[in-house]
Amino acid sequence: MEPSGKEDHNCLPQDLGQEEIDYKQLLEEYYQPLQACENKCWCKKCCFHCMLCFHKKGLGIRYHVYRKRGPGTNKKIPGGGEEAIRRAIDLCFFNRTCSRTHTANGQTTEKKKATA
């Protein structure tokens, strides 16, 4: 038997002229509600046999695909990190107890506290 160049799988008939695709049945199967489908074949008939396969195989849409995180994404900042930054912002802006002010040329000067 000579190789025909086509894969031999159970979804296609052996003799293509023997069976004609029933498009009405194909449309009925397509418009059924989405259900889990474990069909691994990528032939034209299997790509269009249900809406889920059409989305996955025909259009390439995948739902709930999570990105893999690299090994260095959860590195901690030394010295407290975000908590230290939050405390500094709270002290400087909300309580107005920061003793430094920034001048126009970018230098910092010490501010004297006004005591009442």
UniProtKB/Swiss-Prot annotation:
One Gene Ontology molecular-function label: RNA binding
Pfam families, per the entry: Tat
InterPro entries to which the protein is assigned, alphabetical: IV_Tat (IPR001831), Tat_dom_sf (IPR036963)
Matching Gene3D superfamilies: Tat domain
Main localization (coarse): host cell
Protein family (similarity comment): Belongs to the lentiviruses Tat family.
Record-given protein name: Protein Tat
